[in-house]
Amino acid sequence: MNINLTMIGQAIAFFIFVVFCMKYVWPPVIQALREREKKIADGLQAAEHAQKDLELAQEKVAKQLREAKQQAAEIIEQANKRANQMLEEAKDQARTEGERLITAAKAEIDQEKNRAKESLRAEVAALALAGAEKILETSVDAGAHSNMLDKLAAEL
């Protein structure tokens, strides 16, 4: 009976130990486990949130990079257009200036040609008059001389 009594005593002690553990030891252990579980869940949630934020940031960076490349391409295209436009304007200005210089040179040549013709007319008229005087061996007065020169210049 000693063994049975010992077993009953051990069972009672075990029961008291279990009640004591359930009352004083088990709640802090369960609370610690729940806190740890909550920390892990919060950490996982924060990691998921950070992953989503990272994906959004990567998408935003990719979008900004595409926009920057597009803007750069537009700026380069505008610069090329402006360069071509400036080149065409310079060509037009050079062409206009060349035409103006050619026109001015032609006008100057015409003026020189007319001056040379007038000079030659005057010289030819003077020579013709001198020749006529020698032939006639008479002198013509200044008024008649001027009239003859004008008529001769008009005929030439």
UniProtKB/Swiss-Prot annotation:
Q: How does it sit in the membrane?
A: Single-pass membrane protein
GO molecular function annotation: proton-transporting ATP synthase activity, rotational mechanism; proton-transporting ATPase activity, rotational mechanism
What's the family?
Belongs to the ATPase B chain family.
Q: Which HAMAP family match?
A: ATP_synth_b_bprime (MF_01398)
Q: Pfam family of this protein, just one? A: ATP-synt_B
What role is this protein assigned?
F(1)F(0) ATP synthase produces ATP from ADP in the presence of a proton or sodium gradient. F-type ATPases consist of two structural domains, F(1) containing the extramembraneous catalytic core and F(0) containing the membrane proton channel, linked together by a central stalk and a peripheral stalk. During catalysis, ATP synthesis in the catalytic domain of F(1) is coupled via a rotary mechanism of the central stalk subunits to proton translocation.
Q: Detail the disulphide connectivity of this chain as listed in its UniProt entry.
A: none
Q: Which InterPro entries match?
A: ATP_synth_B-like_membr_sf (IPR028987), ATP_synth_b/b'su_bac/chlpt (IPR002146), ATP_synth_F0_bsu_bac (IPR005864), ATP_synthase_B_chain (IPR050059)
Q: What keywords would UniProt list here?
A: ATP synthesis, Cell inner membrane, Cell membrane, CF(0), Hydrogen ion transport, Ion transport, Membrane, Transmembrane, Transmembrane helix, Transport
Oligomeric form and interacting partners: F-type ATPases have 2 components, F(1) - the catalytic core - and F(0) - the membrane proton channel. F(1) has five subunits: alpha(3), beta(3), gamma(1), delta(1), epsilon(1). F(0) has three main subunits: a(1), b(2) and c(10-14). The alpha and beta chains form an alternating ring which encloses part of the gamma chain. F(1) is attached to F(0) by a central stalk formed by the gamma and epsilon chains, while a peripheral stalk is formed by the delta and b chains.
* Entry GO CC: plasma membrane; proton-transporting ATP synthase complex
Transmembrane ranges? Answer: 5-25
Q: Which PANTHER family match?
A: ATP SYNTHASE SUBUNIT B, ATP SYNTHASE SUBUNIT B', CHLOROPLASTIC
Protein name, as recorded: ATP synthase subunit b
Q: Where in the cell is it found?
A: Cell inner membrane
